[in-house]
A protein has these predicted regions:
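Tandem repeat scaffolds
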Residues: 2-186
């Protein structure tokens, strides 16, 4: 299936595009709100400013994909692979990212308020200025992550690996840190 066919089928009311292969495709500003893209292969795809709100992207491959300013609010990205993906300024509020792989992803300025990032791998991710208010990061790997100026107010950081993470000027009011790595600033 190509991009044109995807758009036509979505416009006709179809929503299940599981395991679709659109690696490297240009999907800039596409509206796939509520689409089922479970296991989709979207490595290197251009999804800048795409509307993927409430979409199911569980198990999707998005390595190196560009999701700059994309709307992923309420989306299910559990077990998705987003290594080195660009999510700068993306909206991920209330998104499900449990066990997602976000190693070296760029989430600078992203909105992740109330997102579920439990057991997510965010090693060396850039979360500078990101909004993680009331996010669940239980057992997440944030080693070597850049969290400068991030808003972590009320976030759950229980059993989180923060080794080498940078949290200068981060907002940490009401943050839960029990059993986690208490070395917050390296």
């Amino acid at each position: 299936m190509n991009v044109e066919e995807l758009v036509q089928r979505y416009s006709a009311g179809e929503r299940d595009f599981s395991i679709i292969d659109l690696r490297g495709a240009v999907l800039e500003e596409i509206n796939l709100s509520g689409a089922i893209l479970h296991g989709a292969m979207l490595d290197g795809a251009n999804l800048r400013r795409a509307n993927l709100s409430q979409a199911t992207l569980s198990g999707a491959a998005l390595k190196g994909a560009d999701l700059t300013q994309a709307d992923l609010s309420g989306a299910d990205l559990s077990d998705a692979v987003l290594d080195e993906a660009i999510l700068e300024g993306a909206i991920l509020d209330s998104a499900i990212l449990d066990q997602a792989d976000l190693k070296a992803a760029n989430l600078a300025g992203a909105v992740l308020s109330e997102a579920d990032l439990s057991e997510a791998d965010l090693e060396a991710a850039n979360l500078t200025g990101a909004d993680l208010e009331v996010a669940n990061l239980h057992q997440a790997n944030l080693s070597k992550a850049a969290l400068e100026r991030a808003n972590l107010e009320g976030a759950n950081l229980e059993d989180v690996n923060l080794a080498g993470a940078k949290l200068e000027d981060a907002k940490l009011e009401d943050t839960v840190l029990e059993s986690g790595d208490s070395t917050l600033i390296s």
